[in-house]
């Protein structure tokens, strides 16, 4: 008696199909048929439509996003190259891929676009204040202003003080300037003449119709000289005293007080802290004609010999710090570590390198720090030799630094795709006929 062995029927597993193989009977690939598959002791069904080969989509991109991101990519890479030139000890030289390669590999992701939008929004907000990429004034309409100017002898402090008024670097310009010195007759006649001339020059402006008219309510701003003892006398520090000189001049219009060569007096004399915080705000609020009140104190050393006195109070209440590029590098570094709390260490090193660059190439430039600016981009500024106020945009540079690091990381991740394949053939140039010589 013979037993007939039935033929083996092959089952079809959709998960192991390559998409091109035609399954055999009884699972013949009918779209309306369901195929059983054993899974953990149970049968489940899969439709043949789930394993149908997908059509490859054509590569699509947004042209506007492509062009806008190109400009931002070039700005970031150019900024990094400049940072390498300024601080090669911190920033290593990098060979960035071309933008087309970066874009084609998916580098323009959400993080990249978010950084681009943040920079764009910040620059749009800053454009409301800028004129040709520069700030029109150092105070940007804020009042009252207490500023400290640091610089050794011969660094151009006197020229800067006169330029603050004559070059329209204050808004509004003062009608009365009180110049305070340690002793009497310390201002040379030539400097007095320069002050009077530049005060008159700054007071007049040419209008569109060709007429020349004063900017203030007076034709000739007043220049007054006082000693330190006179300026800090009790009757002048008391705002309710009838002989207070500051109350009298504030009734005429904007006032500027300049304290020069008084560092020893400030360190060793009695407390005059009321001159640096209470007096300016009260005078500015009391008189309607006093639309501006400025106090500028000149210090020859950023680190006085004693930590007591009026200098620490002055630094705390100062709304503006202007540093000469003639000061030593270690003093600027100490200033950075004391005030630059909101920026990264890499940007601190970059600021130190930029200050060193100014010391070597633009000796009579200045670096200005404002604790409470109208925009975060204007916290750090530079004043060049033409007295142009240029914002350093440290907050935007922070975003450039983060984006540059992400580009570098992206390039390292896709190193194999970015590597150039070696040439399979090498073409050798043949010499023209008749150039071979027999030996």
UniProtKB/Swiss-Prot annotation:
GO terms for biological process: DNA-templated transcription; nuclear capsid assembly; regulation of DNA-templated transcription; viral DNA genome packaging via site-specific sequence recognition; viral release from host cell; viral transcription. Signal peptide: none annotated. GO terms for cellular component: host cell nucleolus; host cell nucleoplasm; virion component. ATP binds at residues 151-158. Induction: Expressed in the intermediate phase of the viral replicative cycle. Its main location: virion. Residues 1-42 are annotated as: Disordered. InterPro entries: Adeno_IVa2, P-loop_NTPase. It is found in: Virion; Host nucleus, Host nucleoplasm; Host nucleus, Host nucleolus. Residues 1-23 have a biased composition (Polar residues). It comes from the Viruses. Keywords: Activator, ATP-binding, DNA-binding, Host nucleus, Nucleotide-binding, Phosphoprotein, Transcription, Transcription regulation, Viral genome packaging, Viral release from host cell, Virion. GO terms for molecular function: ATP binding; DNA binding. Residues 419-439 are annotated as: DNA-binding. Component of the packaging machinery which encapsidates the viral DNA into preformed capsids and transcriptional activator of the viral major late promoter (MLP). Binds, along with packaging proteins 2 and 3, to the specific packaging sequence on the left end of viral genomic DNA and displays ATPase activity thereby providing the power stroke of the packaging machinery. The activity of packaging protein IVa2 is stimulated by protein 33K which acts as a terminase. May be the protein that pumps DNA into the capsid powered by ATP hydrolysis. Homodimer. Part of a genome packaging complex composed of packaging proteins 1, 2 and 3; this complex specifically binds to the packaging sequence on the left end of viral genomic DNA and performs packaging of the viral genome. Interacts with protein 33K. Belongs to the adenoviridae packaging protein 1 family. This is Packaging protein 1.
């Amino acid at each position: 008696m013979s037993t007939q062995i039935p033929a083996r029927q092959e089952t079809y597993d959709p998960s192991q199909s390559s998409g091109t193989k035609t399954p055999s009977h009884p699972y013949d690939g009918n779209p309306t048929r369901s195929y059983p598959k054993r899974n953990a002791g149970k049968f489940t069904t899969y439709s043949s439509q789930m394993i149908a080969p997908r059509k490859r989509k054509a590569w699509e991109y947004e042209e506007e996003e492509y062009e806008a991101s190109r400009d931002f990519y070039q700005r970031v890479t150019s900024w990094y190259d400049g940072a390498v030139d300024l601080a090669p000890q911190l920033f290593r030289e990098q060979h960035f891929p071309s933008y087309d390669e970066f874009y084609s590999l998916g580098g323009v992701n959400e993080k990249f676009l978010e950084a681009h939008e943040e920079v764009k929004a910040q620059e749009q907000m800053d454009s409301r204040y800028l004129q040709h990429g520069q700030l029109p004034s150092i105070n940007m309409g804020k009042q009252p202003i207490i500023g400290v100017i640091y610089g050794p002898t011969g660094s151009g402090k006197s020229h800067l003080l006169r330029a603050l008024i004559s070059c329209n670097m204050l808004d509004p310009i003062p009608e009365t300037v009180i110049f305070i010195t340690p002793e009497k007759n310390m201002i040379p006649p030539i400097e007095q003449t320069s002050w009077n001339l530049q005060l008159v020059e700054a007071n007049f402006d040419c209008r569109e119709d060709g007429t020349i008219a004063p900017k203030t309510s007076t034709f000739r701003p007043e220049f007054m000289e006082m000693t330190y003892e006179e300026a800090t006398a009790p009757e002048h520090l008391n705002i309710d005293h009838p002989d207070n000189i500051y109350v009298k001049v504030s009734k005429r219009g904007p006032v500027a007080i300049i304290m020069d060569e008084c560092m020893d007096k400030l360190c060793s004399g009695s407390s005059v802290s009321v001159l640096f915080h209470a007096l300016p705000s009260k005078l500015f609020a009391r008189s309607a004609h006093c639309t501006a009140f400025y106090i500028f104190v000149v210090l020859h050393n950023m680190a006085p010999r004693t930590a007591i006195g009026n200098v620490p109070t002055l630094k705390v209440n100062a709304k503006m710090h202007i540093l000469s590029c003639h000061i030593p590098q270690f003093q600027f570094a100490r200033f950075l570590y004391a005030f630059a709390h909101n920026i990264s260490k890499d940007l601190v090193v970059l600021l130190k390198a930029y200050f060193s660059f100014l010391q070597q190439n633009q000796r009579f430039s200045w670096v200005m720090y404002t604790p409470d600016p109208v925009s975060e981009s204007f916290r750090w500024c530079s004043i060049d030799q033409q007295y142009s106020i240029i914002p350093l945009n440290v907050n935007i540079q922070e975003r450039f630094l983060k984006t540059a690091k992400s580009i570098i990381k992206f390039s390292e991740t896709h190193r194999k795709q970015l590597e150039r394949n070696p040439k399979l053939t090498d073409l050798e140039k043949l010499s023209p006929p008749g150039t071979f010589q027999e030996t």
